[in-house]
Amino acid sequence: MFELNKKILLKRGVTIDSIAEITFQQQSKYTDNISRSMCVESVEKILSLRDVFHHVQLACEIDRLAEEKMFQGPIQDIIYEDLGLFGIDETMGLDVSGLYGTIGQTNFGDIDVNKHGIVKRLNDAGKEDGICHTFLDDIVGAIAAAASTRVAQVTNEEIAHEETGVKRFSIFDI
């Protein structure tokens, strides 16, 4: 699944590093000393999940079909023009980012509103004739949001293990 996601994203102009860059920018606002390699690792982890595989593949295919004018009726123009009140693309993004809870969804909202990096480039390119990234820009932003949340979780877990006064226990130990 990871390799297929990587392949279709690359075909649409998206690299793992470009997603990891957004992950880094998003999480470095809240966490000191995160590494880009941890961001790349988190993006790769997200891209290996079955649900994300389905979202990435579907998003890319819908955008491709819209570019080829394969939809009929008003939905063709709605998708191709990325109309503002069409929210299915954001709903898919919320679903992906929601894999990491409400913090993931909050991160997605921030990335979606303040578009930067590859998300901005996809959004801007989608306004050019013959190009549609209606779904892809949101899915890429959602992957970055989920990866950012994963980085926060991993980092906080590492910090907790460093604390000398913190004792781990399991409910099964009680």
Range-by-range predicted roles:
Residues E21-Q25, T91-T102, D138-A146:
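Short, hydrophobic/amphipathic alpha-helical patches that form generic packing surfaces
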Residues F2-A66:
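N-terminal interaction modules that seed assembly of large macromolecular complexes
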